Amino acid sequence: MLIDSHIHVGQYYDQYHSPADIVRLADDVGIDYLAVSSTTMCDEDYEKVLSEIQELKGLLGDRLLPTMWITPFGLEGNIAWFLESDIKWSCLKVHPFLHKNDWLPAGSQFAEVIDIARELEIPLLIHTGVDECCRSSKYISLMSSNPDITFILAHGQPHEDALMVLNNCNNAFVDSAFMCLQQMVEIVETGFANRLLWGTDMLIPSHFSPKQDMVCYYKSKLASFKKSVSIQDYEQVTFKNAMRVFRM
């Protein structure tokens, strides 16, 4: 089995990744279940985002784990479009790098998102990176004060910060989207194979490597990881952890 916990549909700069593109990738690679959010959300186009997720649901059925991407502007009222839809959401997502002055760990906006995650009983995915606004360690207090919520640190960056968070917060996971193989293996060897989720950010890599075949890219990274860890750890990362996180 293979579960990809970090995939995108929608508009990304000059590229548009349609629901059909995502389904084609999933079938060609052999992804059994996939957690998908829409990058069209960057344009605050709620109607389009819902349309994309609905179309994906029609194409993938129960294979789809819909991720609700929440923006600060959306919290002011438009989030009702998502909450009142007939979509059974599997995960929430926020992107502090895109809204540097809004997603403060102790702020009211994060508190509201936490309340939604708690009400829906689903995990919260947070984009992390090397910038101060979204470092993994920035959210330790948030995770510690909400032990009943499962947090996914997308990308798990900076790497040293992510390891520190995993060591201090039992409700924290990281995903491997845009994470190099060496860092993935180090997480496993450090004893956190049960807290790493397979995620690829597909089809975003095609923006940075437009000439590369994405199916080959995907299969190559998956094969390299499989060769680098035990079969038990490989299965833990590629589907067993996700089954726990998404309550499958």
Language-model segments: which ranges?
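Hydrophobic faces of well-ordered beta-strands that scaffold small-molecule active sites
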Residues: I3-I7, L34-V36, L64-M68, S90-V94, ...
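Conserved, mostly hydrophobic/aromatic
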Residues: H6, A26, I53, L92, ...
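Acidic-and-aromatic substrate-binding clefts and catalytic sites of carbohydrate-active enzymes
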Residues: Q11-H17, T40-K48, I70-N78, H99-A106, ...
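Mid-to-C-terminal alpha-helical segments outside catalytic/metal-binding sites
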Residues: M1-S5, Y16-Y33, R118, K211-M248
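Catalytic pocket-lining loop regions of alpha/beta-barrel enzymes
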Residues: L104-W198
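Divalent metal-dependent hydrolysis catalytic cores, especially in the metallo-beta-lactamase
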Residues: S5-H8, D14, A20-E44, R63-T71, ...
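Short, flexible/disordered intra-domain loops and linkers
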Residues: C42-Y46, L104, S206-C216
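Active-site gating/metal-coordination segments in enzymes
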Residues: K48-L124, N170-F173, I187
